[in-house]
Amino acid sequence: NVKAVWEHVKGHEEVYGAEALYRAFLCDPQTQTYFAGKDLSENSAFLHSHGKKVMCALTNAIAHIDDIDGCMSKLSDKHAHELMVDPGNFDILAHHILTVLAMFLSQLLTCANHRSVDKFLSCVKNVLTSRYR
């Protein structure tokens, strides 16, 4: 399940998050729009810092899995109203997070665990996009 997989993410949030963001920026350049003037190169301090923030937010959501909406409410407001992030970018990032987990945790990412993580990321995406309506 997602909690079991995420136990192996803990302590590696910066590495996994930076890799997922780097892949998103490289494969889907439109995601770079919100980071004008930032160094988005593979080893940049910004990329590693922001990647860690993203993965730590997901770690927090898992810790509050019964109330993802409540725990991600402020992030949802920020992304919708302040940053005005295109909601489609959450799908893109979720895809790259799954890719990174498959790279680093291939033995753990069975079909059932893949489905569990994918469902969790979909729930998070739904919460983050709920303020757009």
Curated annotation (Swiss-Prot):
<keyword id="KW-0408">Iron</keyword>
<keyword id="KW-0561">Oxygen transport</keyword>
<dbReference type="GO" id="GO:0019825">
    <property type="term" value="F:oxygen binding"/>
</dbReference>
<dbReference type="GO" id="GO:0072562">
    <property type="term" value="C:blood microparticle"/>
</dbReference>
<comment type="subunit">
    <text>Minor hemoglobin is a heterotetramer of two alpha-2 chains and two beta-2 chains.</text>
</comment>
<dbReference type="InterPro" id="IPR012292">
    <property type="entry name" value="Globin/Proto"/>
</dbReference>
<dbReference type="GO" id="GO:0005833">
    <property type="term" value="C:hemoglobin complex"/>
</dbReference>
<keyword id="KW-0349">Heme</keyword>
<dbReference type="Pfam" id="PF00042">
    <property type="entry name" value="Globin"/>
</dbReference>
<feature type="binding site" description="proximal binding residue">
    <location>
        <position position="79"/>
    </location>
    <ligand>
        <name>heme b</name>
    </ligand>
</feature>
<comment type="similarity">
    <text>Belongs to the globin family.</text>
</comment>
<dbReference type="InterPro" id="IPR050056">
    <property type="entry name" value="Hemoglobin_oxygen_transport"/>
</dbReference>
<keyword id="KW-0813">Transport</keyword>
<protein>
    <recommendedName>
        <fullName>Hemoglobin subunit alpha-2</fullName>
    </recommendedName>
</protein>
<dbReference type="InterPro" id="IPR002338">
    <property type="entry name" value="Hemoglobin_a-typ"/>
</dbReference>
<dbReference type="GO" id="GO:0005344">
    <property type="term" value="F:oxygen carrier activity"/>
</dbReference>
<dbReference type="GO" id="GO:0004601">
    <property type="term" value="F:peroxidase activity"/>
</dbReference>
<dbReference type="GO" id="GO:0043177">
    <property type="term" value="F:organic acid binding"/>
</dbReference>
<dbReference type="GO" id="GO:0020037">
    <property type="term" value="F:heme binding"/>
</dbReference>
<dbReference type="InterPro" id="IPR009050">
    <property type="entry name" value="Globin-like_sf"/>
</dbReference>
<feature type="domain" description="Globin">
    <location>
        <begin position="1"/>
        <end position="133"/>
    </location>
</feature>
<dbReference type="GO" id="GO:0031720">
    <property type="term" value="F:haptoglobin binding"/>
</dbReference>
<comment type="function">
    <text>Involved in oxygen transport from the lung to the various peripheral tissues.</text>
</comment>
<dbReference type="GO" id="GO:0031838">
    <property type="term" value="C:haptoglobin-hemoglobin complex"/>
</dbReference>
<dbReference type="GO" id="GO:0046872">
    <property type="term" value="F:metal ion binding"/>
</dbReference>
<dbReference type="GO" id="GO:0042744">
    <property type="term" value="P:hydrogen peroxide catabolic process"/>
</dbReference>
<feature type="binding site">
    <location>
        <position position="50"/>
    </location>
    <ligand>
        <name>O2</name>
    </ligand>
</feature>
<keyword id="KW-0479">Metal-binding</keyword>
<dbReference type="InterPro" id="IPR000971">
    <property type="entry name" value="Globin"/>
</dbReference>
